[in-house]
From Swiss-Prot:
This is Glutamate--tRNA ligase. GO terms for biological process: amide biosynthetic process; glutamyl-tRNA aminoacylation. It is found in: Cytoplasm. It catalyses: tRNA(Glu) + L-glutamate + ATP = L-glutamyl-tRNA(Glu) + AMP + diphosphate. GO terms for molecular function: ATP binding; glutamate-tRNA ligase activity. A motif ('HIGH' region) lies at residues 114-124.
């Protein structure tokens, strides 16, 4: 990273920290600063691993200033930010705005409506993060409703139901009710009948191409004026499975001349020949389309507020035709933009990830290379860290960027104090060692002397990382052990004191003893890295978090006969 870019990063961080601290009347936090800063400065993102270390001392310095000093400094750096502070609504500075017309409802009731066609990728975590946060804010209610009424195109995965509920639990939320739409098909049939009797629907046997041509020309199909009795009879025949896929649909009678063709006489029910994978729903052949099913359920469950993607604005408009036939009030709707997530080479797509697993390119949904919620959990990322980062994105209609470094910064706040420090050397180079102490005793945590120290036997050789081997005749400081000089392929202890490190003359590097180290495989987003950890790593239990010094945090996964395995969380 060049010096100009580093100075820009420090300046942006200082400005953001000053604004954040004054706005919230509290210390600025790395996690709250990092996400927006990376979103507003795309050229920072390639350096996401380095930036937390650069901005942490800047934020610490800002937090040490008085409010008056902060305001004066912000006036120097960004006077427009001072003006923005003055214009802030002092009543609410939370990233999520108040829900529209929340006071008009006895209860805030929301729904999370996943399609169970596979476990969740990282982007899916945004909805439960926001809905769960709103539930807590308003002491509200939310259900998980599995929208599983498409047995063919978005075929449900039987394992996904439980995996999605596990993901929600991992994120820290508990739904008040769990519903499968495929258990409610008879309810949708009953509302289909009611809609027909209200004059709001008709059966249509036009092929898709013919109807599309008529619709685009704002012309009614010949079945539109069919009488109610005939429509009811044909709908019952659909329910009884007397038609095959494509032979008959039930359409909502809207406005055939509506300026938006997508709203003209849309399909409410269609025939599907493929059986549903759930045994309880396998006999149904007449299935509701999502817009009909979802609209009915939102009313039946008393949903007050819906959050959905901005690309689904037509869904609300379609459903409002049904609501008008039944004289129902439509819920409040918040449309938000898409979230783009960096740090992954794999497309954020359930079908893509599933295909890579089937092809053997990924081990499973919790492979550290996979952009999935299960992967983040196995890597040791706390669910609350994901929630905090997602909530910071707000609910704007604009597309937003989530820098994974902001998730990592949030997680660092949770794990930094608890994680013991340990050494792990990747692809180690063995160097004989002459002289120096027989053992080293670095602290388990640099900020917690009461936690004690770990004893590392040295032996007569050590492993260091290839990039840490100095040129012949040069010195390094083996962390927790002391200074050595590289002479004729070996390390020889010297009597230098710590001043050579403070003066910048000697680098500090980590190491492990060659004889008593523990083989360890570190699984990362970029692939597996083999190496050796210091003795004692095998005493940690699965799910324990450690920090491999100069590398980052990792979750201990297991200890096999030949090696230990850990999953890399983040720097």
């Amino acid at each position: 990273m060049d010096e100009d870019l580093r100075e820009r990063i420090e300046r942006e961080a200082e400005t953001a920290a000053l604004f954040n601290a004054l706005k919230h009347e509290s210390d600025a936090q790395v996690g709250a600063i990092l996400g927006p800063m990376m979103g507003e400065n795309p050229d920072f993102r390639p350096h996401g691993d380095e930036i937390p270390g650069i901005i942490s001392p800047v934020i610490e310095r800002v937090n040490g200033l008085s409010d008056e000093e902060k305001r004066e400094r912000l006036e120097e750096l960004a006077p427009e930010k001072v003006e923005a502070l003055a214009a802030e609504d002092e009543g609410d500075d939370r990233p999520l705005p108040e829900l529209p017309n929340a006071d008009a409802y006895d209860d805030v009731r929301m729904r999370l409506a996943p399609n169970p066609n596979g476990p969740w990728h990282v982007g899916h975590a945004r909805m439960p993060a926001v809905i769960g946060t709103y539930k807590d804010r308003y002491d509200g209610w939310f259900c998980v409703r599995f929208d599983d009424t498409d047995p063919e195109t978005k075929r449900p995965d039987l394992d996904a139901y439980g995996e999605i509920l596990d993901a929600i639990d991992y994120l820290g939320f508990e739904p008040d009710e769990v519903v499968k739409a495929s258990d409610r098909v008879e309810t949708y049939y009953e509302y289909g009948r009611k809609l027909i009797k209200a004059g709001g629907a008709y059966t249509c046997s036009c092929d898709a191409e013919s109807f599309s041509e008529l619709k685009n020309n704002a012309e009614a199909c010949p079945h539109r004026d069919k009488d109610i009795e005939t429509t009811l009879s044909e709908f019952e025949a659909m329910i009884d499975g007397e038609y095959s896929a494509g032979e008959m649909v039930l359409r909502v009678r809207t406005d055939i001349e509506h300026k938006n063709p997508a709203l003209r006489d849309w399909v409410a029910f269609r025939m599907v020949d493929t059986p549903h994978p759930r045994e309880e729903a396998a006999d149904y052949r007449c299935w509701p389309m999502l817009d009909f099913q979802s609209g009915i359920d939102d009313h039946e469950f008393g949903i007050s507020h819906i959050i959905r993607g901005i690309d689904l604005q037509d869904s609300a408009k379609r459903q409002q035709f049904v609501y008008e036939y039944f004289d129902w009030e439509y819920p409040e709707v918040i449309h938000w933009g898409h979230v783009q997530i960096d740090a992954y080479d794999i497309e954020m797509s359930t079908s893509t990830i599933k295909q890579l697993i089937d092809d053997g390119e990924l081990d499973d949904w919790d492979d550290p290379r996979a952009p999935t919620v299960a992967s983040l959990k196995r890597r040791g990322i706390r669910g609350q860290a994901i929630v905090n980062a997602m909530v910071e994105l707000g609910t704007s209609t604009s597309n937003v960027d989530l820098a994974m470094s902001s998730v990592y910064a949030e997680n660092r706040e949770f794990v930094d104090d608890e994680a013991d420090r340990r050494f792990f050397v990747r692809d180690g180079v063995e160097k004989p060692l002459a002289g120096g102490p027989e053992s080293a005793s670095p602290p388990l945590h640099p900020n917690d002397e009461d936690r004690g120290r770990r004893e590392i036997p040295v032996g007569d050789a050590v492993y260091v990382e290839p990039d840490d081997v100095p040129a012949d005749g040069e010195r390094v400081w083996l962390k927790g052990l002391g200074p050595v000089r590289h002479e004729d392929g070996a390390f020889v202890a010297t009597d230098d004191d710590i001043e050579v490190v403070r003066d910048g003359a000697v680098d500090v590097v980590h190491w492990v003893p060659a004889q008593e180290s523990v083989p360890l495989r570190l699984r990362t987003v970029d692939g597996d890295e083999a190496g050796h950890a210091e003795p004692g790593i095998e005493t940690y239990d699965a799910d324990d978090i450690v920090q491999f010094e100069r590398i980052g945090f990792a979750r201990i996964d297991r200890h096999d006969d030949e090696e230990s395995v850990a999953y890399f969380a983040h720097p």
